[in-house]
Amino acid sequence: DRSVSRGLGDVYKRQVLGNIREVSTQELKNDSYYMQGDYTGDLGVEKSYEAYLRGEKGQEVFLRNAYGRIKGRYENGAFDREAVPGKNLTLAIDMELQQYGEQLMQNKVGAIVAIEPSTGEILALVSSPTYKPSLLTGRERGSNYAQLFENPYKPLYDRAIMAAYPPGSTFKPTQGLIFLQEKAVTPYTTYPCHHGFYSSGVKVACHDHVSPISLVPAISTSCNAYFCYAFRAMIDNLDKYGTTGAAFEAWKKYIVDMGYGYRLGVDLPGESRGFIPNSDFYSKIYGANGWKGITVISVSIGQGEVLATPLQIANLAATIANRGYYFTPHVVRSVENTYLGDAVSYTHLRAHETL
């Protein structure tokens, strides 16, 4: 019996907790634990923590006579085994924050992720639109699933961890940290911005603000021009890196270290890795020596080929709050087994250093 405490919204039930379903023929072949008619986790925590939640099956061995009648326990029950209940999970989700996020996303398409920087615990995880989990139970499960699958708004799609979007201006703090680390700029380096960046026939528009501008106000005002200039100052520095490709690889390494381009390892199924291009990606398009900073300038402001999940973007904010490291985001705070009386701590305490 898998019980859930407190009243919960549909988003939380579907996206975080998930649901259970009858095991498939393939699962029966792959795992000797299951028997026909057993249930297993299908989505969310139910799937990720199935091995903890399902417990251990009990066993009773009986002695039968030649007519198949039970005569008693075999060897007085020496081979019997008591069932062990599954372990209880404690989640990190802040229910008030989760419910508030769900309210904000009603009738909208998108996602909300909130992370506690000091632990990596996910306090809220919202994807919209969603559906009622009860639709995927009972006799109508198959037809309901087909309708949800064909819905153009993709309610089955967990946008918080599966969707990949251009991170846009949320990417600029990352860029600023890289440029400082590589000494492409200082905190006092200024660049002009007259409603945008203009160079070699390329135009990247920007809004009206003071000019010239240095790094901190460039972040606070989200100046596109500043990051275009600074990006070129790093990528086109052949004296330091030798080639454009080498400079770009140095840039990419920082981005990956900050949690982009690969799965973060959240304890929920279906996480996307997003996309961070490497130098080979552009060399195949333009030739090894046919591109430079201006060619891929949209990358400098989180556009172009750069894609990130909402989880990765939220994790960057946690990394900055921690001044250069993050913990693997996770929704489960602890795992315990009240039957055995022990407590198993489930934590992601290894810090991932970035800068």
Where are the regions a protein language model picked out?
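Conserved, well-ordered alpha-helix/loop/beta-strand core segments that scaffold catalytic motifs
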Residues: G72-A111
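Beta-lactam-recognizing serine transpeptidase/beta-lactamase-like catalytic domain environment
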Residues: N65-I70, Y74-A78, S118-T170, T174-E353
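Peptidoglycan glycan-strand catalytic modules in the bacterial/periplasmic cell-wall system
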Residues: D1, R6-G9, F79-E82, G86, ...
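Carboxylate/His-rich catalytic cores and anion/metal-binding grooves
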Residues: L43-L63, V109-S134
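Short, solvent-exposed loop/turn elements at domain surfaces
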Residues: S24-E27, L264
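Single conserved hydrophobic/aromatic residue that forms the stacking wall/gate
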Residues: R2-Y12, H348-L355
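Short, Φ-rich (hydrophobic/aromatic) sequence segments
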Residues: D31, D42-V61, A66, A314-A317, ...
